[in-house]
């Protein structure tokens, strides 16, 4: 009977330790999962902070400066059309170059709206199709379309992207890498430049709005 009691005692003791080890194992596993979850949450928070900083300290300010300068460009061109002085033309060239500079800086992050909405090729296709431009502007009704109230929409819908964007405006404003002389830009080309600059402005603001929310 004593031997049987010993056997029972050993069996109970073994069961107790077995349950204890299992409980410890479960506790350790739970602690490990909690620790890993905490680390993952910390990583996610760090990544979110990096992304937020990239968007609001790099992307948004870049597109904002580009958009503001593109808006100034349209105003400059309209002012030059009313008052064709060299100072007004130089101001348009200055704002064009500033907007273009910010666009070139943004080429480091052409993902997102620039690619999703096809804005990159829309405003930066090269080369400009000069023969097609001459042919288009040879028709009076085409010039009238670009000179209406919806001049920017007309540019977007009537012109192909080989006639749009920075290179289209640049062709009108500059010659041999320098601002053209005041009074040398034909009226039809000035109408074209204003319309294309308006479409360019719209695309720049679309980029900004897409990132800024």
Summary of predicted features, one role per range:
Residues 34-213:
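Mature extracytoplasmic or organellar-lumen-exposed domains after removal of signal/transit peptides
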Residues 19-23:
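C-terminal motif of bacterial Sec signal peptides marking the signal peptidase cleavage site
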Residues 14-18:
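Alpha-helical transmembrane segments
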Residues 25-28:
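Bacterial signal peptide processing site
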Residues 1-11:
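Bacterial N-terminal signal peptides that target proteins for export
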């Amino acid at each position: 009977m004593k031997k049987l009691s010993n056997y029972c005692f050993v069996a109970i003791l073994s069961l107790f330790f077995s349950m204890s080890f299992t409980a410890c194992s479960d506790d350790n596993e739970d602690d490990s999962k909690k620790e890993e979850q905490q680390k993952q949450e910390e990583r996610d928070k760090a990544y979110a902070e990096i992304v937020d900083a990239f968007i609001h300290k790099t992307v948004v300010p870049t597109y904002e400066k580009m958009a503001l300068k593109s808006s100034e460009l349209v105003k400059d061109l309209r002012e030059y059309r009313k008052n064709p002085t060299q100072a007004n033309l130089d101001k348009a060239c200055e704002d064009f170059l500033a907007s273009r500079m910010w666009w070139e800086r943004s080429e480091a992050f052409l993902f997102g709206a620039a690619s999703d909405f096809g804005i990159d090729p829309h405003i930066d296709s090269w080369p400009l199709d000069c023969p097609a431009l001459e042919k288009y502007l040879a028709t009076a009704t085409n010039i009238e379309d670009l000179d209406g109230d919806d001049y920017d929409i007309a540019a977007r819908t009537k012109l192909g992207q080989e006639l749009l964007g920075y290179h289209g405006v640049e062709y009108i404003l500059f010659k041999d890498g320098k601002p053209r002389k005041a009074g040398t830009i034909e009226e039809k080309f000035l109408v074209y430049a204003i319309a294309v600059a308006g479409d360019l402005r719209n695309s720049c603001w679309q980029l900004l709005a897409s990132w800024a929310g």
